[in-house]
Regions:
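Conserved N-terminal subdomain of the carbohydrate kinase-like
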Residues: 1-52
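Short, charged, surface-exposed secondary-structure boundary motifs
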Residues: 10-12, 92, 107-110, 161-165
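Buried hydrophobic positions in well-ordered alpha/beta secondary-structure cores of metabolic enzymes
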Residues: 13, 53-56, 143, 168, ...
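Active-site donor-binding loop signature of nucleotide-sugar glycosyltransferases
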Residues: 18, 27, 100, 156-157
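A short, flexible beta-alpha/helix-coil linker loop
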Residues: 21-22, 29-30, 104-106, 159-160
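Short glycine-centered, acidic/aromatic-flanked micro-motifs in structured strand/loop junctions
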Residues: 27-29, 55-58, 177
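Conserved phosphate/ATP/ADP-binding segment of small-molecule kinases
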Residues: 52, 60-151
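Conserved post-catalytic alpha-helical subdomain immediately downstream of the catalytic base
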Residues: 132-133, 157-187
Length: 187
């Protein structure tokens, strides 16, 4: 655990209406360069002890060195999964897979007019970033996995959900365990 005395604990204010989260406001400070450098050193030291590495980028500055971390992990033969953030995915190049949600994917590649257009845009992004795969979570439309050998679409089972917080985290964690155990992508 890295401690940065200059950083206060993030406080998250959630605004709820009719049992659903309407918005969240975060009060926080950015970690120092020294703390981030120490985190990178700790990551490198612990890397041999894992089979897969999961990065959830919340855009808060904690993954400033993610490009280097991905490079180190892949060089060590590790599976690297990234839940991305923002509109520039170049820093995730070389990961095994990234898992943007539908709106994050649109932010990066633009709108698509149909499934064929989405497949084309996903293939272009996957190739540009040298990824093995790209998984787009699509809310009520399920999820779509894009690999060099084609696309796989998994439909969603509709449910009334009051708070979708953590849904993407659940997807990437499940995928990490499956891939670390040698499961086939299609499973």
């Amino acid at each position: 655990l890295q401690v940065d005395e200059a950083v206060t604990t993030t406080v998250k204010l959630r605004v709820i209406g009719r049992q659903q989260q309407l918005l969240r406001i975060d009060f926080e400070t950015t970690p120092s360069h020294e703390a981030l450098r120490a985190k990178l050193s700790e990551f490198e030291r612990r890397l041999p002890d894992c089979d897969a590495v999961v990065f959830s980028d919340y855009g808060k500055g904690g993954l400033t060195h993610i490009g280097e971390m991905i490079r180190l992990a892949r060089a060590a033969g590790k599976i690297v999964l990234v839940d991305p953030k923002g509109d520039d995915y170049a820093c995730y190049a070389g990961a095994t897979i990234i898992t943007p949600n539908r709106s994050e994917m649109r932010e990066v590649v633009g709108r698509w007019k149909d499934e064929a257009d989405l497949e084309q845009k996903a293939a272009a992004l996957r190739n540009e970033l040298a990824l093995d795969a790209l998984l787009v979570t699509r809310s009520e439309e399920g999820m779509s996995l894009f690999r060099a050998d084609g696309a796989l679409h998994e439909k969603a089972v509709a449910r009334e959900v009051y708070d979708v917080s953590g849904a993407g985290d659940t997807v990437i964690a499940t995928l990490a365990v499956m891939l670390a155990q040698g499961a086939d992508w299609a499973k």
